[in-house]
């Protein structure tokens, strides 16, 4: 993926704009619980409150390509031209989130505390999901930083939400510190 800063061009009457350039991330393949969808984490995360180290939470890791060029596991149907012809196997995957003008959009941005310029903040909070130890997955969602309580019975343990912590490795450890809880923001335009 060749991402060289801000992309702005006109296609008909719509403006296309690069909002996030970053690292593809998701649940660890070897863990049964936690989040169940892929996200694009920005190159420049923003932190708020966090507890260093691992707690009873969900986690998120960088996505690597699992694309074999030969052998019985051969499954690579992708061009490697953008990688200098080098194999993609076990390499971290980049990502991008773009905006197409002229359409109503609501966007959840993980690892950010502020919306892009020209966007409206709906709410800010922390990334949440099912816990990694609970044996099943749920979507990563942005949970309001000041949650409210609904009517209903308590302590039923039927569906649960936990903060999501970073696991670095495929995510660069210099900016994504293992054990930190991820922020998020929901923006509209």
Question: What are these model-predicted stretches?
Answer:
Residues 4, 11-177, 181-189:
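Folded, disulfide-stabilized extracellular/luminal domains of secretory-pathway proteins
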């Amino acid at each position: 993926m060749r991402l060289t800063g801000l992309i702005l061009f006109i296609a008909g009457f719509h403006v296309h704009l690069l909002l996030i350039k970053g690292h593809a991330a998701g649940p660890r393949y070897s863990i049964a619980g936690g989040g169940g969808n892929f996200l694009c984490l920005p190159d420049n995360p923003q932190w708020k409150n966090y507890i260093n180290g691992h707690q009873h939470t969900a986690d998120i890791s960088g996505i690597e390509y699992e694309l074999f060029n030969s052998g019985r596991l051969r499954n690579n149907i992708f061009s490697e031209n953008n990688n200098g012809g080098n194999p993609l196997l076990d390499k971290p995957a980049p990502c991008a989130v773009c905006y197409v003008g002229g359409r109503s959009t609501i966007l959840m941005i993980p690892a950010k505390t502020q919306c892009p310029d020209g966007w409206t903040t709906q709410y800010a909070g922390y990334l949440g999901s099912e816990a990694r130890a609970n044996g099943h997955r749920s979507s990563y969602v942005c949970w309001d930083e000041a949650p409210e309580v609904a009517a209903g019975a308590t302590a039923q343990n039927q569906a649960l939400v936990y903060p999501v912590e970073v696991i670095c490795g495929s995510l660069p450890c210099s900016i994504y510190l293992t054990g930190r809880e991820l922020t998020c923001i929901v923006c509209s335009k």
